[in-house]
């Protein structure tokens, strides 16, 4: 008797699994609250050079700025330069003009801001940009914080993947909660930029535990029939986290208190560990029969499935252990051992890189829309709901491959069209970005489902973990691409759209999995690939 048969006896889907789904919803809410936190925490409000002896009289301030600050091409005051010598200023009181005798002839000389900056505090009371002046020449350091965070997530995923197999999912989930809480508090108390970047990278590593542990802990208690559906449904908690972050960000305008608010939910998470079950499958592979028996009994009781003592006897569980241990633990190298697996893995790598690259590129930099950051994120969060509903029907109607390729291609097209639309038409730009976000989210949701059906059972978790790592690489690079606007204003959009287009083309090289039997072994993948090679279409 294998574990799947044992799980069928105690109930592969019921109140026990639903309770588990609810208990593991909190990490899914926490992830977007930290992953998308830079939208508010690292926001750059309108700013200009700090000027000496600025008048207290508000009616004179605009005239004062005109004498000290050059204009940009759009008519706004420069954010990074000031005049070396004050320009002519009509004297409101005397009706004369005052000139600085030190002004050389010719074009007015401009210099960088040497005395710091003044910021518009109407939308944010403080951000990391305003606290450490991460603007102008230091603008890149602001983007680096997000990149370092996602690098931390990538590295943490490798560590947690190994440790959770060695010490258990439940124990490492507790470690993830505690370390996220501690490091989040340290980040909020950062006294300088270096401390902040370091603690945020470590926080990303801690949060990676949720991305690696929660899904297996959920799926290993579900029967095969309900795993895919539960996996897609659980992504709605991410959308809930996006909307919750928008609300919290609107209520809390200081980055330190906002970071604290995003971190404190770890406290009830730590308490919830008491009710989270360890994976019985993992316990059996470790020879911890009594613990596995305890959780299996609880599962059967909550699901209302009467089970005989013989089914959970030492002898019966030892047979399950024997069958589980027969299978060699897979590694990332196994994903490239055969020709068809190499094909699937390479295509999935490009797909996941493109999905993450475009999603975080759109989400983390939505400037120039003519909306407040809160309105933008509310739109972004709201549009994810119809995106998931659309995916639910499309994958059944036209299949996984065409849905994924179509959504990535549509994302690329929105970037392409936005290149042709004038930045002055805010309404059109806003509509394109929101539509692009909807397509990008749909591609993200489909990618989870599609990837899980491409890999055989023996490599499914390994394949999902590996492609997710590649995706996080795309997420870490996405914030830096914005800096390319210094080379050419349209280059970031071209990069996001180009990668999305390449990913869409790559997806078309993958086999369709709609109504196809899921592969169990590597041999199943190879046989399926040979059928496609001979006929050009899948013979499921």
Curated annotation (Swiss-Prot):
Could you tell me which Pfam families the record lists for this protein?
Sugar_tr
Show the stretches that span the lipid bilayer.
21-41, 144-164, 172-192, 202-222, 232-252, 257-277, 344-364, 378-398, 402-422, 429-449, 462-484, 488-510
Q: Which domain of life is it from?
A: Eukaryota
Q: In which tissues is it expressed?
A: Abundant expression in male and female kidney. In kidney, expressed at the brush border of the proximal tubule S3 segment (S3) in the outer stripe and medullary rays. In kidney, expression is higher in female than male. Also expressed in female liver.
Specify the protein's topology with respect to the membrane. Multi-pass membrane protein
GO terms for biological process, alphabetical: alpha-ketoglutarate transport; monoatomic ion transport; organic anion transport; prostaglandin transport; response to stilbenoid
CC per GO annotation: apical plasma membrane; basal plasma membrane; basolateral plasma membrane; plasma membrane
Keywords of this entry: Cell membrane, Ion transport, Membrane, Transmembrane, Transmembrane helix, Transport
| The keyword Cell membrane belongs to this UniProt entry's keyword annotation | yes
**Stored InterPro entries:** MFS_dom (IPR020846), MFS_sugar_transport-like (IPR005828), MFS_trans_sf (IPR036259), Orgcat_transp/SVOP (IPR004749)
PROSITE patterns in alphabetical order: MFS
Where is this protein found?
Basolateral cell membrane; Apical cell membrane; Cell membrane
Please write the reaction equations for the catalytic activity of this protein: orotate(out) + L-glutamate(in) = orotate(in) + L-glutamate(out); 3',5'-cyclic GMP(in) = 3',5'-cyclic GMP(out); GMP(in) = GMP(out); 2'-deoxyguanosine(in) = 2'-deoxyguanosine(out)
Q: Which GO terms describe its molecular function?
A: alpha-ketoglutarate transmembrane transporter activity; organic anion transmembrane transporter activity; prostaglandin transmembrane transporter activity; sodium-independent organic anion transmembrane transporter activity
**PANTHER family to which the protein is assigned, alphabetical:** SOLUTE CARRIER FAMILY 22 MEMBER
Function recorded in the entry: Functions as a Na(+)-independent bidirectional multispecific transporter. Contributes to the renal and hepatic elimination of endogenous organic compounds from the systemic circulation into the urine and bile, respectively. Capable of transporting a wide range of purine and pyrimidine nucleobases, nucleosides, and nucleotides with cGMP, 2'deoxyguanosine and GMP being the preferred substrates.
**Family in the record:** Belongs to the major facilitator (TC 2.A.1) superfamily. Organic cation transporter (TC 2.A.1.19) family.
- Other remarks? Involved in the uptake of clinically used drugs such as bumetanide, and contributes to renal and hepatic drug elimination.
What is the name of this protein?
Solute carrier family 22 member 7
Which species does this protein come from? Mus musculus
Taxonomic classification: Eukaryota, Metazoa, Chordata, Craniata, Vertebrata
